[in-house]
Design a protein with these regions (language model features):
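Peripheral, non-transmembrane regulatory/ligand-interaction domains of membrane transport proteins
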Residues: 1-104
């Protein structure tokens, strides 16, 4: 699913469609057609959008043309039903910066 947000004054408002300067937030369930729409319209490499879906992805920074990818690992509560003693696990989060948009 795609959500679009833009700052107006000191508040962030949800938009109905993509506009220049907006934040694009991509959440499950992922639709291949929506991802392709973003890559084509913004010129983002598809792997920039999909790399953070890999639970084993490492934190890193990449630059391709004028598009930046930042992958960070953030802790979340381990909700696994196994008897694993680890209270927290880390999951990757991708942040893509283009000249006109932020994509998460």
């Amino acid at each position: 699913m795609l959500y679009f947000f833009q700052q107006q004054g000191d508040k962030i408002h949800r938009l109905e469609k993509m506009e220049s300067g907006c934040w694009i937030h991509v959440t499950p369930p992922f639709n291949e057609a929506e991802l392709e729409k973003i890559t084509e319209r913004l010129g983002i490499p598809m792997d920039f959008l999909t790399d953070s879906l890999d639970i084993d992805e490492r934190a890193r920074y990449e630059l391709e043309d004028d598009i930046k990818l930042i992958v960070i690992n953030t802790p979340i509560l381990n909700e696994s039903v196994t008897s694993e003693p680890t209270l927290y696990i880390t999951v990757p989060i991708g942040v893509i910066l283009t000249p006109d948009h932020v994509v998460t």
